[in-house]
């Protein structure tokens, strides 16, 4: 199973490099259902001026456009970075069952921040919380983030 996660995370890293090359934070995301990539997302909030163009949300939109709305609850979200609060809401709304990510984002992450949207059971309509696997290719994700911070004096 770890090899499978590594394969999809390598694809996310390639998407993150596309985001970085276009002036965006280096985030890439995939939605996978039954071994098939059903949605892809490249972070584009900065380049488009639309803050909702986070890689995870773009991947969900792409999966829906590809006809997979009813399968989202059975899909796995792969992403280079822990989903933020906004993306975590979308994940819970669509009941995506598993999330695999590289690096944590403790200030605004849906799993590690004090707002912990990904594990709350306080919203009954969200159902069961997703399984979360973190730290897959963390070092590579952190390097891309550092490259973005240096390029943008952050």
Segments predicted by a language model, with ranges:
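Generic structural signal for well-ordered alpha-helical scaffold segments
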Residues: 13-17, 60, 64-65
